[in-house]
Amino acid sequence: MLPLLLASSSAYRRELLARLHLPFTWASPDIDEQRLDGEPPVELVRRLARQKAEALAGSHPRHLIIGSDQVAVLGEQVLGKPHTFERACEQLLECSGQQVSFLTGLALLNSATGQCQVDCVPFTVTLRELSREQVERYVAAEQPLDCAGSFKAEGLGVSLFQSTHGCDATSLIGLPLIRLVDMLTKEGVMVP
């Protein structure tokens, strides 16, 4: 088996990948994550996932490189990482009582052959009706400033949900393991 490399500095993605009990290393790719003019969100996350994997291919020949990227979408609006307390509160108040789609792009690049599998795994969350006080308490408690949509589904963020819908709950955290296992299997990796 070629060595696995996770093209991410995200602790959340490392924790998810560790669930597969496969040895792996990780490195942070340096790419421009700006959305292209008119680029649909699905194509954005697919492109960025692939670019993250490709960015590390030169320094990691003969690896299986996993790239992933996620955006939250409310209607037609792409919600990025809020980075500030105020913006996180604004995002959550905008999403209150609404359905938010999380699109997670996934790429598995075999840097020895150049073959790359790419997909987008959607997951939908309907948020409860939230008051400003609830939102501010949540953001203060969990500090979801580096999370698309301003919440951490793997933590207290689940308390904001009214319902969820999707094929792979791990995609909500940023690395869709069910789809990744399919991709790894096509590369001859046995899981479990």
Curated annotation (Swiss-Prot):
Chief localisation class: cytoplasm
EC numbers: 3.6.1.-
Biological processes annotated in GO: nucleotide metabolic process
Keyword Cytoplasm: yes
Swiss-Prot/TrEMBL site (Important for substrate specificity) positions: 12, 70, 154
GO molecular function: nucleoside triphosphate diphosphatase activity
Gene3D superfamilies (alphabetical): 3.90.950.10
Compartments it resides in: Cytoplasm
A Pfam family it matches: Maf
UniProt-listed SUPFAM superfamilies: ITPase-like (SSF52972)
Gene Ontology cellular component terms for the protein in this record: cytoplasm
Reactions mediated catalytically: N(7)-methyl-GTP + H2O = N(7)-methyl-GMP + diphosphate + H(+)
Functional note: Nucleoside triphosphate pyrophosphatase that hydrolyzes 7-methyl-GTP (m(7)GTP). May have a dual role in cell division arrest and in preventing the incorporation of modified nucleotides into cellular nucleic acids.
HAMAP family: Maf
Protein family according to the UniProt entry: Belongs to the Maf family. YceF subfamily.
Protein name, UniProt field: 7-methyl-GTP pyrophosphatase
Organism in which the protein naturally occurs: Pseudomonas putida (strain ATCC 47054 / DSM 6125 / CFBP 8728 / NCIMB 11950 / KT2440)
UniProt lineage: Bacteria, Pseudomonadati, Pseudomonadota, Gammaproteobacteria, Pseudomonadales
GN (gene name): maf-2
